[in-house]
Amino acid sequence: NMIFEQLFDTKSSTYTYILSSGKGREALIIDPVLEHTDQYINFLNKLELKLVKVIDTHIHADHITGLNELSERTNCTKIMGENSKSEVVDLRVKEDENVKIDNINLKVMYTPGHTDCSYSYLMNDRVFTGDTLLINGTGRTDFQNGNARQQYDSIFNKLLKLPENTIVYPAHDYNGKKPVSYTHLTLPTKALV
């Protein structure tokens, strides 16, 4: 049974995702927050998961990534898109490449706009959009080499062209109305048009 965990950091309003094909298998984390590293490690240990890959959808301005700490503690591979200027990355991925663990496959989509290094990751009927597309809005484009035209193109010509039942999993919910226990902030793409 696939493990799919969505965690929320109230301080930075960040969503982190833990994926695995099942108990005792390999795991992958998307957009980890440094302060929650122990929580992630405990979750992994409880389910006997081996963290092999960790992804940041882009360079985050609102929180410190947990990439380095997780890599130091688990020896996992740190992944970002090829346009990332981060110097701590082990593997840079590009459009249409795949990030795989066991039988889970994430297709890489370059979705600039919020930043020039924003990437989304498509997993079957789910898409992890980072800050490019949020549930009730989009990420800012006025800093970090953001570009409103690119953002529009990424949203309307890539993300919203996915099948309409594709579920959007963003990196943030800035409304701040969701308690930590509210664990599935999502919408199908058809509801966002």
What are these regions (language model features)?
Residues 2-50, 120-130, 136:
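Conserved beta-strand hairpin/beta-sheet module of binuclear metal-dependent hydrolase folds
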Residues 13, 24, 34-110:
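Active-site HxH/HxHxD metal-binding segment of metal-dependent hydrolases
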Residues 18, 98-123:
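Core dinuclear metal-dependent hydrolase active-site scaffold
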Residues 32, 59, 83-84, 115, ...:
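Active-site metal-binding loops of divalent metal-dependent hydrolases
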Residues 52-58, 111, 129-130, 171, ...:
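Ser/Thr-glycine-rich phosphate-binding loops at phosphate-binding pockets of nucleotides
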Residues 145-168:
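An active-site-proximal "capping" alpha-helix that borders the catalytic cofactor pocket
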Residues 162-180:
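Anionic-ligand binding patches
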Residues 183-189:
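Conserved small/polar residues in nucleotide/adenosyl-binding loops
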